[in-house]
UniProtKB/Swiss-Prot annotation:
PROSITE patterns: AAA. It holds the Pfam family AAA. ATP binds at G228, E229, P230, G231, N232, G233, K234, S235. InterPro entries: AAA+_ATPase, ATPase_AAA_core, ATPase_AAA_CS, BCS1_N, Mitochondrial_chaperone_BCS1, P-loop_NTPase. This is Probable mitochondrial chaperone BCS1-A. Residues 1-10 are mitochondrial intermembrane. It comes from Dictyostelium discoideum. Keywords: ATP-binding, Chaperone, Hydrolase, Membrane, Mitochondrion, Mitochondrion inner membrane, Nucleotide-binding, Transmembrane, Transmembrane helix. The chain crosses the membrane at residues 11-31. The gene is bcs1la. The keyword Amino-acid biosynthesis does not apply. SUPFAM superfamilies: P-loop containing nucleoside triphosphate hydrolases. It catalyses: ATP + H2O = ADP + phosphate + H(+). SMART domains: AAA, BCS1_N. Chaperone necessary for the assembly of mitochondrial respiratory chain complex III.
Length: 421
């Protein structure tokens, strides 16, 4: 009987202890929640805060501003990021706030920076979501607005009169490639007939007629294919057009080992505003429909590869980006499947051929800064045949005689055509 009493006491004590622990832990949680609520209310009455999401353009502006701000460099924890410049120039290392809390002085006042990296991934971009919180005392609230305006102005001024180049990064996002390039003059790209004016007028018409497309239910996007022998200025023309129309260039590398159907869809539908999408040497990625059907069959179990159908869906799927200007280039149009360059995907096809005599004469006068119809230029071009040499071959020859146009004329017949394919 005593044994049963002892057991009953033990059970009662156990239950009482459990209830006590439960009540204590519950009380602690309630106390913590109430404390956090009170703290948040106090903070909301003392501090002013703005959150900037990594999906917004202002996130990039803010990071650039911070990298140029000396007061952030006294922080104990920074990230070193490499900025790649053009070929032949050394890359540049910039310092930006790492994930965590930082404090800077702006116009003599304290500003708190909190960079947060989410556990969640943006599956389309293949990168974690990020945000930056900027806070200060409520009495200094206007400083944050001034800071953001200053960050925007600094970033935009960096790009004024320049062409920004974006490339598809390994995480599926667009990344700036090096420093913005100086705008290339459209007059420096010498093409036959009126190809430049025809292309420029078509793009301008597209840009200014958005409402016309929308009113008729026509997808508001435009595609161009530049084709022809290599070395005749297809890429140079696109760079010059971007400069003329104040557009940036987003280069899509289909040969990247990291790119797949999901990423190409994300890239083509999330290009920075006021930019040209450029897919160079499309024939090298997709030579023909037959090749890619075989490739798709072989890779049917591989979810990490770009497929032909995946590219087509990205080009004109339901989610295709409105206002998109797309350029493709190829040296061999005959290798492209007709479905890839049909109307609706490619609206205008322009052949960029080897140099004519007229182009050679124009290049000569441009190279030596001579008047139009100069007799030296005419003599130079008379020694060449139409469509025999590429513009890059002629330019390469002239570079040997940068200070002697007469010598270039004497040696012009030494230029030997060769196949760049």
């Amino acid at each position: 009987m005593n044994h049963l009493k002892d057991q009953s006491k033990s059970i009662v004590l156990g239950i009482s202890s459990g209830i006590g622990i439960f009540l204590i832990s519950g009380g602690i949680n309630i106390f913590k929640n109430v404390g956090q609520y009170i703290l948040n209310r106090i903070n909301s009455n003392i501090y002013y805060r703005i959150d900037v999401d990594s999906k917004d353009k202002s996130f990039e502006w803010l990071l650039y501003w911070l990298s140029e701000n000396d007061s952030i460099k006294v922080s104990n924890h920074l990230n070193a990021e490499t900025v790649y410049n053009l070929v032949g120039k050394n890359p540049k290392v910039i310092l930006v706030p790492s994930v965590g809390k930082h404090r800077i002085v702006y116009k003599g006042k304290w500003i708190w920076i909190d960079r947060v990296r989410d556990q969640q991934f943006d599956m389309g971009a293949g990168a974690p979501f990020e945000s930056i919180s900027i806070s200060t005392y409520k009495s200094n609230a206007q400083l944050i607005n001034q800071l953001l305006q200053e960050a925007m102005t600094l970033s935009l001024n960096r790009d004024i009169g320049k062409t920004v180049i974006y490339i598809n990064g390994g995480n599926g996002n667009w990344e700036r490639f090096g420093n913005p390039r100086s705008i290339r003059s459209l007059s420096s790209v010498i093409l036959a007939d009126d190809l430049k004016s025809k292309l420029i007028e078509d793009i301008k018409s597209f840009i200014t007629n958005e409402s016309w497309y929308r009113n008729r239910g026509i997808p508001y996007r435009r595609g161009y294919l530049l084709y022809g022998e290599p070395g005749n200025g297809k890429s140079s023309l696109i760079n010059a057009i971007a400069g003329e129309l104040n557009l940036d260039i987003c280069i899509v590398s289909l040969s990247s080992k990291d790119i797949d159907d999901k990423q190409i869809n994300h890239l083509l539908n999330n290009a920075p505003p006021k930019s040209i999408l450029l897919i160079e040497d499309i024939d090298a990625a997709f030579k023909s429909h037959r090749d890619n059907v075989d490739s798709n069959n072989n890779n049917s179990n591989n979810n990490n590869s770009l497929t032909y159908s995946g590219l087509l869906n990205a080009l004109d799927g339901v989610a295709s980006q409105e206002g998109r200007i797309l350029f493709m280039t190829t040296n061999k149009i005959e290798l492209l499947d007709s479905a890839l360059i049909r109307e609706g995907r490619i609206d205008l096809k322009i052949k960029v051929s080897n140099a004519t005599k007229s182009q050679a004469a124009q290049l000569f006068t441009h190279f030596y800064n001579l008047p139009t119809d100069n007799q030296l230029a005419i003599r130079f071009s008379e020694n060449l045949h139409d469509h025999q040499l590429s513009m890059s071959q002629i330019q390469g020859f002239l570079l040997k005689y940068i200070n002697s146009p007469e010598k270039a004329i004497e040696e012009v017949q030494s230029i030997t055509p060769f196949n760049l394919n």
